[in-house]
UniProtKB/Swiss-Prot annotation:
Alphabetic keyword roster: Cell cycle, Cytoplasm, GTP-binding, Nucleotide-binding, Nucleotidyltransferase, Transferase
UniProt-recorded name of the protein: Mannose-1-phosphate guanyltransferase
Lineage: Eukaryota, Fungi, Dikarya, Ascomycota, Saccharomycotina
Subcellular location: Cytoplasm
Gene: MPG1
Species this protein is from: Pichia angusta (Yeast)
Chemical reaction(s) catalysed: alpha-D-mannose 1-phosphate + GTP + H(+) = GDP-alpha-D-mannose + diphosphate
C-alpha cells in the first residue's frame, strides 16, 4: 500500500507559527500535525509514504526521517519546483505510486479526524470504482462544494455543486481519498486540481464513490479551526479513555479533555481545562487559569495569568496577571509583560508586548 500526503506551501493561514516551522511540523496534540497522518497510513498497512512538499523541504526531511524506523515505512519527499495543486503531486510521484497495483491513499495535511483508512479501503475495494472520496456532513453546506449522489446506485457520485444556494445535500469533500493507480493516467504533469479536473472525469465515467466519515473532522489550517480541532481531538481521546490524557483526578484539571506532557511543571492552585494541551518543558505558575488553548513546548505562563482560546508559541513567556483571549496567537519567543491584556493578537516571533492589545490585530 502507498500513501501520499499533500503538504503544500507556506502555511500563511497559520502565521505567525509557520514563520518558524513548516505547518505540518507544528505540534497538534503534542505531536507534529503530519505525524497523525503518517501513523494512520502506517496502521492501514502503507509501507511507502510520499510527502508532496514545496516549502522548506530540507527542514521536513530532517524532522521526519527519524519516523521511518518507528513506523516501519519508507518516507519519500516529492519536492515541487512550483506548486502543482492537488493532482500534480500524484503525477510527480508516479514512479513510486504506480510501482504496484495496490490502491493509493491521498491525505490533506491540514485535516484532522479519526482516519478510518482500513474501513475506507474495504469500502473502496467492494464497490469496484476507480476512486473514493471521504465525505463529512456539515451544518452549513452553502459554504462548500457539495456531493450529490446517484438516485439508483448507493454512494455513487452524480455531480458536485459548488456553494449551493438551495439545499442539495450536506456532504462535502473531507480531503481524504483512495484511488486506483490508473487514476494517475488521467493527470497531466502541470499545476492541476484533482477536485476540479480529475474527479469530474470519473463522475462522467460513473467510477467515483463517496464514503461517509464517522466521528469528527476539521481542517486545522487556521488558528480558530486549529483550536476547534484540538477540542474535537481531545473529546475523541476522552471517548476512547486514552492514556494520553491527564487524569481528571489531578486537582488542577478542570472539566477534563486535558493533555499535558509529563515534563511540564504545574504550580499550585491552577485550573487547567477544559480542552487544553500543554507541551514539553512548559512551566505553569501558581494560580494560572488555562482554557481551550495550546501551550507549545518550553513556554512559561507566570502566576495568576489567564489564557483562553489562545495558542502560545514555543519558548514564549506570559507575564503575571496577564490575560490572553479571543484566538490570540503568540509566535516563537514572544514575551507578554505582566498585567498586559491581549485580545485576538497575532504576535510575530521575538516580540515583547508591554501595552494592551484590545482589538484583534497583527503585532509586527
Amino acid at each position: 500500500m502507498k500513501g501520499l500526503i499533500l503538504v503544500g506551501g507556506y502555511g500563511t493561514r497559520l502565521r505567525p507559527l509557520t514563520l518558524s516551522l513548516p505547518k505540518p511540523l507544528v505540534e497538534f496534540g503534542n505531536r507534529p500535525m503530519i505525524l497523525h497522518q503518517i501513523e494512520a497510513l502506517a496502521n492501514a498497512g502503507c509501507t511507502d509514504i510520499v510527502l508532496a512538499v514545496n516549502y522548506k523541504p530540507e527542514v521536513m526531511v530532517g524532522a521526519l526521517k527519524q519516523y521511518e524506523k518507528e513506523y516501519g515505512v519508507s518516507i519519500t519527499f516529492s519536492v515541487e519546483e512550483e506548486p502543482l495543486g492537488t493532482a500534480g503531486p500524484l503525477k510527480l510521484a508516479e514512479k513510486i505510486l504506480k510501482k504496484d497495483n495496490t490502491p493509493i491513499f491521498v491525505l490533506n495535511s491540514d485535516v484532522i479526524c479519526e482516519y478510518p483508512l482500513r474501513d475506507l479501503l474495504e469500502f473502496h475495494t467492494a464497490h469496484g470504482g476507480e476512486a473514493t472520496i471521504v465525505a463529512t456532513k456539515v451544518d452549513e453546506p452553502s459554504k462548500y462544494g457539495v456531493i450529490v449522489h446517484d438516485r439508483d446506485v448507493p454512494n455513487l457520485i452524480e455531480r458536485f455543486v459548488e456553494k449551493p444556494v438551495e439545499f442539495v445535500g450536506n456532504r462535502i469533500n473531507a480531503g481524504i481519498y483512495v484511488l486506483n493507480p490508473s487514476v494517475i493516467d488521467l493527470i497531466e504533469m502541470r499545476p492541476t486540481s484533482i477536485e476540479h479536473e480529475t474527479f469530474p472525469i470519473l463522475v462522467e465515467q460513473k467510477k467515483l464513490y463517496s464514503f461517509d466519515l464517522p466521528g469528527y473532522w476539521m481542517d486545522v489550517g487556521q488558528p480558530k479551526d486549529f483550536l476547534s480541532g484540538m477540542c474535537l481531538y481531545l473529546s475523541a481521546l476522552t471517548k476512547k479513555n486514552s492514556n494520553l490524557l491527564t487524569s481528571t483526578s489531578e486537582e488542577y484539571v478542570n472539566g477534563g479533555n486535558v493533555l499535558i506532557d509529563p515534563s511540564a511543571k504545574i504550580g499550585k492552585g491552577c485550573k487547567i481545562g477544559p480542552n487544553v494541551v500543554i507541551g514539553p518543558n512548559c512551566i505553569i505558575g501558581d494560580g494560572v487559569r488555562i482554557q481551550r488553548s495550546t501551550i507549545l513546548k518550553n513556554s512559561q505562563i507566570k502566576d495568576h495569568a489567564w489564557v483562553k482560546s489562545t495558542i502560545v508559541g514555543w519558548n514564549s513567556t506570559v507575564g503575571k496577571w496577564a490575560r490572553l483571549e479571543g484566538v490570540t496567537v503568540l509566535g516563537e519567543d514572544v514575551t507578554v509583560k505582566d498585567e498586559v491584556y491581549v485580545n485576538g493578537g497575532k504576535v510575530l516571533p521575538h516580540k515583547s508586548i508591554k501595552d494592551n492589545v484590545e482589538t484583534p490585530q497583527i503585532i509586527m
